[in-house]
Amino acid sequence: MPLKRPELDDPEIRELLEQGMGHNTYGEPFWPNDILIFGVVILGTIFGVIALAVLDPAKMGEPADPFNTPLHILPEWYFYPVFQILRVVPNKLLGVVLMAAIPIGLALVPFIENVNKFQNPFRRPLATAVFLIGTVVTMYLGIGAMIPDIPKSLTLGLF
């Protein structure tokens, strides 16, 4: 059923409007009280941020030196598994292919056992197994990326 404009000639709507429906009959009026308060709060926040930036600027670290990079540079924590793949795989092309396989694999996850309409994970063994294996491999690669030595990063320093 399509939406239609309310007709103000309709007696039911006229009666509701006469009883005060659709009007704020309680509290403070929006204009000018709320509008003025909103403006004061917004401008006060902007001026406060500018004052903090001017009076107490953030201290910058030492300047970057492109000829003296640290030995152990790590990306952000959410890139650890991909970083470990690139670090461990000897062939650059294979590393790029494996990195491209990650979003492709994630895009295919909804189609695994799509015919099985059960929501209980114990009744969807293939999807549950893929999820658990993916989680374990991702955690393994993420923990291994934090270890600087590549042979130790493959065994997580356990052997």
Swiss-Prot record:
One of its GO terms (biological process) is photosynthetic electron transport chain. PROSITE patterns: CYTB_CTER. SUPFAM superfamilies: a domain/subunit of cytochrome bc1 complex (Ubiquinol-cytochrome c reductase). It holds the Pfam family Cytochrom_B_C. GO terms for cellular component: plasma membrane; thylakoid membrane. The keyword Membrane applies. Signal peptide: none annotated. CDD domains: cytochrome_b_C. The chain crosses the membrane at residues 35-55, 93-113, 127-147. This is Cytochrome b6-f complex subunit 4. It comes from Gloeobacter violaceus (strain ATCC 29082 / PCC 7421). The lineage of its organism: Bacteria, Bacillati, Cyanobacteriota, Cyanophyceae, Gloeobacterales.
